[in-house]
Protein backbone atom coordinates (compact mmCIF):
# COMPACT_ATOMS: atom_id res chain seq x y z
CA UNK A 1 0.00 0.00 0.00
CA UNK A 2 1.20 3.49 -0.79
CA UNK A 3 -0.29 6.01 1.62
CA UNK A 4 -0.96 9.62 0.84
CA UNK A 5 0.75 12.03 3.21
CA UNK A 6 -2.51 13.01 4.88
CA UNK A 7 -3.86 9.46 5.04
CA UNK A 8 -0.74 8.40 6.92
CA UNK A 9 -0.90 11.47 9.15
CA UNK A 10 -4.45 10.58 10.23
CA UNK A 11 -3.48 6.93 10.83
CA UNK A 12 -0.44 7.87 12.92
CA UNK A 13 -2.44 10.42 14.89
CA UNK A 14 -5.04 7.75 15.69
CA UNK A 15 -2.17 5.58 16.98
CA UNK A 16 -1.05 8.39 19.33
CA UNK A 17 2.18 9.15 17.46
CA UNK A 18 1.77 12.93 17.69
CA UNK A 19 4.27 13.84 20.40
CA UNK A 20 5.43 10.25 20.93
CA UNK A 21 9.04 10.28 22.11
CA UNK A 22 8.87 14.07 22.03
CA UNK A 23 8.44 14.19 18.23
CA UNK A 24 5.61 15.93 16.43
CA UNK A 25 3.34 14.13 14.00
CA UNK A 26 4.98 16.06 11.14
CA UNK A 27 8.35 14.53 12.06
CA UNK A 28 6.96 11.00 11.87
CA UNK A 29 5.25 11.59 8.53
CA UNK A 30 8.30 13.37 7.12
CA UNK A 31 10.50 10.45 8.15
CA UNK A 32 8.18 7.96 6.41
CA UNK A 33 8.14 10.09 3.26
CA UNK A 34 11.91 10.14 2.94
CA UNK A 35 12.49 6.57 4.13
CA UNK A 36 9.88 4.75 2.00
CA UNK A 37 7.90 7.29 -0.03
CA UNK A 38 4.92 6.14 2.08
CA UNK A 39 5.15 2.63 0.59
CA UNK A 40 4.52 -0.28 2.98
CA UNK A 41 6.31 -2.66 0.58
CA UNK A 42 9.56 -0.66 0.45
CA UNK A 43 12.66 -2.82 0.72
CA UNK A 44 16.33 -1.83 0.69
CA UNK A 45 18.90 -4.61 0.60
CA UNK A 46 21.87 -2.38 -0.14
CA UNK A 47 23.18 -1.18 3.22
CA UNK A 48 26.97 -0.96 3.50
CA UNK A 49 27.00 -3.38 6.45
CA UNK A 50 25.04 -6.00 4.51
CA UNK A 51 21.81 -5.42 6.41
CA UNK A 52 18.38 -4.74 4.89
CA UNK A 53 15.56 -2.29 5.65
CA UNK A 54 11.88 -3.16 5.54
CA UNK A 55 8.60 -1.34 5.11
CA UNK A 56 7.12 2.08 5.71
CA UNK A 57 9.74 3.06 8.30
CA UNK A 58 12.62 1.05 6.75
CA UNK A 59 13.24 -0.99 9.89
CA UNK A 60 16.52 -2.85 9.85
CA UNK A 61 17.13 -6.60 10.08
CA UNK A 62 20.29 -6.15 12.14
CA UNK A 63 18.54 -4.49 15.06
CA UNK A 64 14.75 -4.45 14.84
CA UNK A 65 13.30 -7.40 12.93
CA UNK A 66 14.25 -10.97 12.06
CA UNK A 67 14.57 -12.48 8.61
CA UNK A 68 16.37 -15.63 7.57
CA UNK A 69 19.34 -13.77 6.11
CA UNK A 70 21.30 -12.77 9.20
CA UNK A 71 21.40 -12.88 12.98
CA UNK A 72 19.46 -10.03 14.53
CA UNK A 73 18.91 -8.37 17.88
CA UNK A 74 15.22 -8.43 16.83
CA UNK A 75 14.37 -5.78 19.41
CA UNK A 76 10.83 -5.45 18.02
CA UNK A 77 10.31 -9.22 18.20
CA UNK A 78 8.86 -9.44 14.70
CA UNK A 79 9.56 -11.14 11.39
CA UNK A 80 10.74 -8.56 8.86
CA UNK A 81 8.24 -9.87 6.31
CA UNK A 82 5.42 -8.64 8.57
CA UNK A 83 6.71 -5.11 8.02
CA UNK A 84 5.94 -5.31 4.29
CA UNK A 85 2.17 -5.86 4.50
CA UNK A 86 -0.61 -3.28 4.48
CA UNK A 87 -1.21 -3.51 8.24
CA UNK A 88 1.10 -0.89 9.71
CA UNK A 89 0.10 -1.35 13.36
CA UNK A 90 3.14 -3.56 13.97
CA UNK A 91 5.39 -1.14 12.06
CA UNK A 92 4.15 1.65 14.33
CA UNK A 93 4.79 -0.44 17.45
CA UNK A 94 8.33 -1.12 16.26
CA UNK A 95 8.95 2.56 15.44
CA UNK A 96 7.87 3.39 18.99
CA UNK A 97 10.43 0.87 20.24
CA UNK A 98 13.17 2.41 18.06
CA UNK A 99 12.56 5.92 19.34
CA UNK A 100 12.81 4.79 22.98
CA UNK A 101 16.54 4.21 22.40
CA UNK A 102 18.91 7.12 23.21
CA UNK A 103 19.33 8.08 19.54
CA UNK A 104 15.61 8.74 19.20
CA UNK A 105 14.60 9.57 15.65
CA UNK A 106 18.25 10.04 14.70
CA UNK A 107 18.21 6.27 14.12
CA UNK A 108 16.64 7.20 10.76
CA UNK A 109 19.27 8.80 8.52
CA UNK A 110 16.62 10.18 6.16
CA UNK A 111 14.96 11.96 9.10
CA UNK A 112 18.29 13.53 10.10
CA UNK A 113 18.94 14.65 6.53
CA UNK A 114 15.48 15.89 5.51
CA UNK A 115 13.36 16.53 8.61
CA UNK A 116 15.46 17.24 11.71
CA UNK A 117 15.56 20.92 12.71
CA UNK A 118 13.52 21.85 9.62
CA UNK A 119 10.43 24.04 9.77
CA UNK A 120 7.68 21.45 9.44
CA UNK A 121 4.91 23.80 10.56
CA UNK A 122 3.28 23.79 7.10
CA UNK A 123 4.08 20.17 6.27
CA UNK A 124 0.67 18.82 7.32
CA UNK A 125 -1.28 22.06 6.86
CA UNK A 126 -3.56 20.62 4.17
CA UNK A 127 -4.46 17.50 6.15
CA UNK A 128 -7.36 18.76 8.30
CA UNK A 129 -5.96 17.25 11.45
Curated annotation (Swiss-Prot):
SUPFAM superfamilies: Lysozyme-like. SMART domains: LYZ1. Residues 1-129 form the C-type lysozyme domain. Ca(2+) binds at residues 82, 85, 87, 90-91. Binds 1 Ca(2+) ion per subunit. The keyword Nucleotidyltransferase does not apply. CDD domains: LYZ_C. Its cofactor is Ca(2+). It is an enzyme of class 3 (hydrolase). InterPro entries: Glyco_hydro_22, Glyco_hydro_22_CS, Glyco_hydro_22_lys, Lysozyme-like_dom_sf. One of its GO terms (biological process) is defense response to bacterium. One of its GO terms (molecular function) is metal ion binding. Its EC number is 3.2.1.17. The active site is at 35, 53. It catalyses: Hydrolysis of (1->4)-beta-linkages between N-acetylmuramic acid and N-acetyl-D-glucosamine residues in a peptidoglycan and between N-acetyl-D-glucosamine residues in chitodextrins. Disulfide bonds join 6-127, 30-115, 65-80, 76-94. Belongs to the glycosyl hydrolase 22 family. Monomer. Lysozyme C is capable of both hydrolysis and transglycosylation; it also shows a slight esterase activity. It acts rapidly on both peptide-substituted and unsubstituted peptidoglycan, and slowly on chitin oligosaccharides. Lysozymes have primarily a bacteriolytic function; those in tissues and body fluids are associated with the monocyte-macrophage system and enhance the activity of immunoagents. This is Lysozyme C, milk isozyme. It comes from Equus caballus (Horse).
